[in-house]
């Protein structure tokens, strides 16, 4: 099902007597894109490849830097080289939190070049540094709290990698 219908995230079939079948579909959300040798690939919150697109179709999606897809195929989870495999896992955690917290539309670039301290551009004003792939849900909670306490004119870096606290550096 998933290779033929890549935008299906989950499918649940339930049967009710006497002769009724209900199919419930949960749709994948196009969230970001990665660049491969053959073009651009759209990924969902689980790093599943949804489709190959041209540069003109990338509007509204976050660019992912630092991961190069290996043999990308529609409907399959993003595969990267052995060294980049942890980056894909971390990317899925980041995208999942962005979707859950309705923050995806404010992210333009996710940089996984440094797997131990990836970051992303948020709201065009902040560079967010995440640190190691641990407590991701907690870090995004701290990020939302920090952003809510800053003014609309504040710009700079929010570092979530130190001491389980959000550190803001203006600039």
Language-model regions: role of each:
Residues 10-171:
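Charged, solvent-exposed interaction patches on well-folded alpha/beta domains
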């Amino acid at each position: 099902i998933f290779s033929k219908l890549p935008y299906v995230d989950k499918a649940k079939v339930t049967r009710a007597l006497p002769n009724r079948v209900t199919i419930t579909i949960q749709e994948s959300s196009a969230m970001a894109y990665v660049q491969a040798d053959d073009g651009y690939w759209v990924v969902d919150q689980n790093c599943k490849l949804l489709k190959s697109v041209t540069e003109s179709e990338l509007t509204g999606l976050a660019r992912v830097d630092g991961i190069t897809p290996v043999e990308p195929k529609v409907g399959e989870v993003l595969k990267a080289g052995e060294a980049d495999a942890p980056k894909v896992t971390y990317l899925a955690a980041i995208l999942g939190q962005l979707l859950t917290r309705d923050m995806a539309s404010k992210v333009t670039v996710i940089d996984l070049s440094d797997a131990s301290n990836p970051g992303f551009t948020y709201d065009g004003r902040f560079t967010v540094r995440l640190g190691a792939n641990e407590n991701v849900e907690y870090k995004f909670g701290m990020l939302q709290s920090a952003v809510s306490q800053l003014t609309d004119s504040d710009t700079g870096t929010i570092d979530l990698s130190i001491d389980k606290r959000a550190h803001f550096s203006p600039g």
